[in-house]
Design a protein with these regions (language model features):
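Gram-negative and organellar
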Residues: 22-474
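Bacterial N-terminal signal peptides that target proteins for export
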Residues: 1-8
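Bacterial N-terminal signal peptides
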Residues: 8-16
Length: 474
């Protein structure tokens, strides 16, 4: 189950095209005619942290320093070439060699050439993330491996006037795992009919068919005589509306998975709603139910919730079995000049198609308070809690993290100090999981420099520096 890092963002506010999401390509029919528009930032970041429990164990604690260097992005450019970047990738080095140096982070990026009115659009996207070897063990480099997924392919648009468009697309995806034998190739084709209603609203009918083939034939569970691939088919109808104070997406349909010649289906839904209830306050709710794989889950809405140095794991721990993902999220954001408050939570279930003993549920909550002390001086307090449960084994963990950050903005650069701690308790039940129980205290300093755009300085930039075990990176 994924552990949500940093302040949780509304799933409808961050949208990266991915396999199975053709509707995110050129959703608006017609065009404004305006030139490229850019928002957000790309930062260089570096930091040094001290932890009194680098191994994240209950006993035999070992202190260590952790150096970090990398980049942090929350950037969007819209135009003939549209670019979206969200996340971070860091290089970690443990000074006392508690673990070997490694890359760590969670990143989603895509580049889309062409506009909805063009007959051809081309997508290139990449997702980089971390997978858990033991789902309940501490998130140290010894229990993590990186996973990368690249997706590319064309979208062919046939526009009928300014209100109707027919789209065909074909995508190729490649998932690569650092050590696990689950690397695969995905071929997906689909079609979409979109009709613009009134204003900034549209209605679309979508269908897709994806084939995922493992490079190692033994990776398909129950595969003898059943080939090396599985299939996911999906059909849905979707409404999108953009109003002055409200954004809404409502998609309903049905999806089917065929794995090792065993077929099963379930309803699909995707609900995203955000509303500004005052000039300073926005509330949001969301819900999602779909079939996914580990690599594909990194591109799902719940994988895009971390930014500005945070990092996430993909859904569950690394296995070749796809799963049914169900998620509900809600929260509110208050921003009134000197003060910011964000409260959010997520409840999620992963139901595995072939390994039901790994079915799990996860609940997370996050509260972030920020205050501008001076025009360029910020303070922020973040409190984060999570609960994860594998009911088949009666195994679970629960944790709480708190961090205080003080930051100073100097033109394109920012400096910060932070201190905090994590307390986690776990029980392995009747499983072989290493359900970690530990506590640790961390302090650190960081530096960021805006390479592109400018980060929104609210006291939290660089929080946790993407270091495993530090607050914000459970």
């Amino acid at each position: 189950m994924k552990l949500i890092a940093r302040t949780l963002l509304l799933i409808s506010l961050v949208s990266v095209p991915a396999l199975g999401r053709a509707q995110q390509i050129g959703q608006q029919i017609g065009g404004t005619g305006y030139g490229p528009m850019s928002t957000g930032y790309v930062d260089f970041l570096a930091g040094l942290a001290y932890t009194d429990n680098a191994l994240l164990t209950a006993g035999g604690q070992r202190n260590d320093g952790i150096g970090t260097v990398g980049f942090d992005a929350d950037y969007s450019r819209q135009g003939t070439l549209s670019i979206n970047l969200l996340g971070n990738i860091d290089r970690l080095q443990y000074i006392r060699n508690s673990f070997s140096g490694s890359f760590y982070g969670n990143f989603n990026g895509d580049a889309l050439w062409g506009t909805p009115s063009d007959p051809l659009q081309w997508l290139l996207s990449d997702s980089f993330g971390e997978g858990m070897v033991d789902p309940l063990a501490a998130s140290t480099p010894a229990n993590l491996q990186w996973v990368n997924q690249v997706t590319t392919g064309p979208y062919l648009n046939l526009n009928f006037g300014l209100r109707n468009r027919f789209t065909l697309y074909g995508l190729y995806g490649r998932s690569s795992y650092q050590t696990s034998p689950y690397s695969s190739q995905t071929y997906e084709g689909g079609a979409e009919i979109t009709h613009k209603l009134a204003g900034s609203t549209s209605l679309s009918l979508q269908a897709s068919d994806a084939r995922t083939a493992y490079l190692d034939p033994a990776a398909l569970i129950g595969s003898p005589g059943h080939g090396t691939a599985y299939y996911i088919k999906q059909a849905q109808i979707e409404f999108q509306g953009r109003y002055v104070r409200t954004n809404v997406t409502l998609g309903v349909g049905y999806n089917i998975i065929d794995y090792a010649r065993h077929q099963q289906g379930a309803p699909y839904y995707n609900v995203q709603l955000s509303r500004s209830i005052s000039p300073f306050t926005t509330v949001f709710v969301g819900a999602l139910s779909e079939y996914a794989s580990f690599g594909g889950s990194m591109q799902s809405p719940t994988a895009l919730l971390g930014a500005e140095g945070g990092a996430l794991q993909g859904a569950g721990f690394i296995t070749s079995s796809p799963f049914k993902e169900r998620m509900v999220t809600a929260g509110a954001d208050y921003n009134r000049g000197l003060t910011t408050v964000t409260l959010s939570g997520i409840y999620q279930q992963d139901l595995y198609t072939q390994q039901s003993q790994y079915d799990n549920r996860d609940a997370t909550a996050d509260l972030t308070l920020g205050r501008k002390l001076q025009p360029t001086l910020f303070i922020q307090l973040q409190v984060y809690g999570s609960y994860e449960d594998y009911s088949h084994y009666h195994a679970h963990t629960h944790s709480i993290t708190a961090m205080l950050t003080l930051s100073k903005q100097l033109a394109r650069a920012a400096f910060g100090l932070y201190a905090g701690g994590t307390q986690q308790s776990g029980s392995p039940g009747v499983s072989s999981f290493n359900a970690a129980s530990y506590h640790d205290i961390e302090v650190g300093v960081y530096f960021t420099y805006d390479l592109l755009g400018q980060a929104n300085s609210s006291g939290g930039a660089g929080l946790g520096m993407g270091v495993p075990g530090l607050p914000g990176v459970p």
